[in-house]
Amino acid sequence: LGGSGGEIIFASDMVYVTRVEHFNAAHKLYNPNWSKEANEAAFGPCANENWHGHNYEIHVTVKGLPDPDSGFIIDVKKLSKIIKEHVLDKVDHKNLNMDVDFMRGQLASTENFVIGIWKELKPHINGGKLHQIRLYETPRIYVDYFGE
């Protein structure tokens, strides 16, 4: 592949660009097929019937070869707008169990949540390939998802 300055861009010149965003949301972990006692045993305080909240941090990584004209894989301003429109506007200051359509009918674990976020974002990423989503539930707990 040729670059604008005559340099050659090789397939091995894969670059990864990550955008970080923050949002707040509430949820509870509760399996309706289990007793209250079983839920409390499995999920502890996360099964609280009055919900609990997190200050989430999301890292969205796109991979690709730099465009020879712009040098970008994806314009990070556009990536931020995509994340806002297709994720943040749907989940920020919401109850994941009750208010978020793509979480309906499933346990609101961070693992299920990151898969749902992937499905919301993937169709809208152009100019690169969605590579990874890292979702921090707390500063010490996060999940990674690669779409596999």
What function would you assign to each model-found segment?
Residues 1-148:
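Charge-rich, low-complexity N-terminal segments
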